[in-house]
């Protein structure tokens, strides 16, 4: 009798333990499933990490475990990593959703608000310290509250998002380049481990079997994603803001293109409006405006109210380039030429378009005193140590010492020096057919 009772208790206890185990297993399974389906609220930067601010977009990490490119990679597809792929896909999905939603901030009635005669588009990478200086200069600009500023990003960063969340002085829209290296870290348009090394000879590349062996650039080098991205981003952005940004659907004004390391003068908007009026009245043949030059001007006296008409040159007039819709439409007709010309610089490629594809070379209206300055003394084309505070202090000193000459009442055209230029020397870095086809595809994308 005692044995039976003991056996019954053992059986009951066994069933209880089994039931508890099943419940626990089911609970963990559901939790894992839910975690897999929910967007990961991780830090925005894979290495450093940072917290998100209330009201900011969810901060999501790419979550990539990078393979080293320093060692020889096998010429076969990497083993699938579902967890990493899922994180990357969610990140891409977030960018797609934000580009679709196009949340406009700092306007009273979103449904009825329309931009005025100028929109700024700022191409942003990852240099938060320079972006902060640009934002500080925009805050000081007279009339900026009437100007929509669109920030076009190719790098997701909580720090940068927080800087832009702090912009309360003008309407703001953020869009995101959907084919960035950050979104495609181990495959094209990022760096695929099966890509050919930059300096490998073509014959050796063909023997090696790397996937872009057939497509070195004009100088025998293979693509480097970090250099290709800037040209991709610029062309995608050009098309996206004119064709896909909803609030600009019927926009008839100009778009002024800036970069994160630019710095604007307090009277840049004032001067822009007067330049636009002058262009319409006295220079209808002018194709574009440029508010920035690299000319060093110590004193604004006698020149702050002067503008010139010149042949557009990429090395002089690529900063603060302002385009009309008509100028954009002529550019976009040259998509094939832009996307296949072997130069990784967007501005040098534009220079080539002005002598090869556009109906005529560009004439640009440009002030003798720049209203947009280049604060970035380091970056893709420079090897200097970044000193953003030093650069901004120098610009501020220049502006403060000449403030009595700013905000001119009228502008006059001082000289007209226009002549067709010879085709520029290409710089290479854009020989890969994958870059060509992706670049050409932007016109077809949503």
From Swiss-Prot:
Gene Ontology biological process: oligosaccharide biosynthetic process; protein N-linked glycosylation; protein N-linked glycosylation via asparagine
> Where does the sequence pass through the membrane?
10-29
The EC number on file is: 2.4.1.143
Which of this chain's residues are annotated to bind Mn(2+)? 261, 374
* Keyword tags: Disulfide bond, Glycoprotein, Glycosyltransferase, Golgi apparatus, Manganese, Membrane, Metal-binding, Signal-anchor, Transferase, Transmembrane, Transmembrane helix
InterPro entries in UniProt: GlcNAc_II, Nucleotide-diphossugar_trans
Q: Which residues bind substrate?
A: 123-127, 154, 229-233, 298
Q: In which pathway does it act?
A: Protein modification; protein glycosylation
Catalytic reactions of this protein: an N(4)-{beta-D-GlcNAc-(1->2)-alpha-D-Man-(1->3)-[alpha-D-Man-(1->6)]-beta-D-Man-(1->4)-beta-D-GlcNAc-(1->4)-beta-D-GlcNAc}-L-asparaginyl-[protein] + UDP-N-acetyl-alpha-D-glucosamine = N(4)-{beta-D-GlcNAc-(1->2)-alpha-D-Man-(1->3)-[beta-D-GlcNAc-(1->2)-alpha-D-Man-(1->6)]-beta-D-Man-(1->4)-beta-D-GlcNAc-(1->4)-beta-D-GlcNAc}-L-asparaginyl-[protein] + UDP + H(+)
Q: Which cysteines are joined by disulfide bonds?
A: 196-210, 283-286, 334-357, 339-439, 378-386
Membrane topology recorded in Swiss-Prot or TrEMBL = Single-pass type II membrane protein
Q: Which residues lie on this side of the membrane: Cytoplasmic?
A: 1-9
Does the record's keyword annotation contain 4Fe-4S? no
Topology Lumenal: residue spans? 30-446
The entry's cellular-component GO terms read:
Golgi membrane; Golgi stack
Cofactor(s) essential for the protein: Mn(2+)
Per its UniProt record, what Pfam families does this chain match? MGAT2 (PF05060)
List where in the cell it is found.
Golgi apparatus membrane
Q: Which residues are glycosylated?
A: 69, 86
Q: Drop me one GO molecular function for this one.
A: protein homodimerization activity
Q: Superkingdom of this entry's organism?
A: Eukaryota
What family does this chain come from, according to its entry? Belongs to the glycosyltransferase 16 (GT16) protein family.
> Its quaternary structure?
Homodimer.
Q: Which PANTHER family match?
A: ALPHA-1,6-MANNOSYL-GLYCOPROTEIN 2-BETA-N-ACETYLGLUCOSAMINYLTRANSFERASE (PTHR12871:SF0), BETA-1,2-N-ACETYLGLUCOSAMINYLTRANSFERASE II (PTHR12871)
What function does this protein fulfil? Plays an essential role in protein N-glycosylation. Catalyzes the transfer of N-acetylglucosamine (GlcNAc) onto the free terminal mannose moiety in the core structure of the nascent N-linked glycan chain, giving rise to the second branch in complex glycans.
> Under which name does UniProt file this protein?
Alpha-1,6-mannosyl-glycoprotein 2-beta-N-acetylglucosaminyltransferase
Q: Which organism is it from?
A: Sus scrofa
The lineage, from the top, is:
Eukaryota, Metazoa, Chordata, Craniata, Vertebrata
Q: Which gene encodes it?
A: MGAT2
């Amino acid at each position: 009798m005692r044995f039976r009772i003991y056996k019954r208790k053992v059986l009951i206890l066994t069933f209880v333990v089994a039931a508890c185990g099943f419940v626990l297993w089911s609970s963990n399974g559901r939790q894992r499933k839910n975690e897999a389906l929910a967007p990961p609220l991780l830090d925005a930067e894979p290495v450093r990490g940072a917290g998100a601010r209330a009201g900011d977009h969810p901060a999501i990490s790419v979550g990539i475990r990078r393979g080293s490119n320093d060692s020889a990679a096998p010429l076969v597809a990497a083993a699938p990593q579902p967890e990493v792929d899922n994180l990357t896909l969610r990140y891409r999905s977030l960018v797609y959703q934000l580009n679709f939603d196009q949340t406009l901030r700092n306007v009273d009635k979103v449904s009825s608000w329309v931009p005025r005669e100028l929109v700024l588009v700022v191409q942003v990478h990852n240099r938060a310290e320079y972006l902060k200086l640009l934002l500080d200069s925009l805050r000081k600009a007279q009339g900026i509250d009437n100007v929509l500023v669109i920030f076009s990003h190719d790098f997701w960063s909580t720090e940068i998002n927080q800087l832009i969340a702090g912009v309360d002085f003008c309407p703001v829209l953020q869009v995101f380049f959907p084919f960035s290296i950050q979104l495609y870290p181990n495959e094209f348009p990022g760096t695929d481990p099966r890509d050919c090394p930059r300096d490998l000879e073509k014959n050796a590349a063909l023997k090696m079997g790397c996937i872009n062996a057939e497509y070195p650039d004009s100088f025998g080098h293979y693509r480097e994603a970090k250099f290709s991205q800037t040209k991709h981003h610029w062309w995608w952005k050009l098309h996206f803001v004119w064709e896909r940004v909803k609030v600009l659907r019927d926009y008839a004004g100009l778009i002024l293109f800036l970069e994160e390391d630019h710095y604007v003068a307090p009277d840049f908007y004032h001067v822009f409006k007067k330049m636009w009026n002058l262009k319409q009245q006295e220079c209808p043949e002018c194709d574009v405006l440029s508010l920035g030059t690299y000319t060093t001007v110590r004193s604004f006296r006698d020149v702050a109210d002067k503008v010139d008409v010149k042949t557009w040159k990429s090395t002089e007039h690529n900063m603060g380039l302002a385009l009309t819709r008509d100028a954009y439409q002529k550019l976009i007709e040259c998509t094939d030429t832009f996307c296949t010309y072997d130069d990784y610089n967007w501005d040098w490629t534009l220079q080539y378009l002005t002598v090869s594809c556009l109906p005529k070379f560009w004439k640009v209206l440009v002030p003798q005193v720049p209203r947009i300055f280049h604060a970035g003394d380091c970056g893709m084309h420079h090897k200097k140590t970044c000193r953003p505070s030093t650069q901004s202090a120098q610009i501020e000193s220049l502006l403060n010492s000449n403030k009595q000459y700013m905000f001119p009442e009228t502008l006059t055209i001082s000289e007209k020096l226009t002549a067709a230029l010879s085709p520029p020397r290409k710089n290479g870095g854009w020989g890969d057919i994958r870059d060509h086809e992706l670049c050409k595809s932007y016109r077809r994308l949503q």
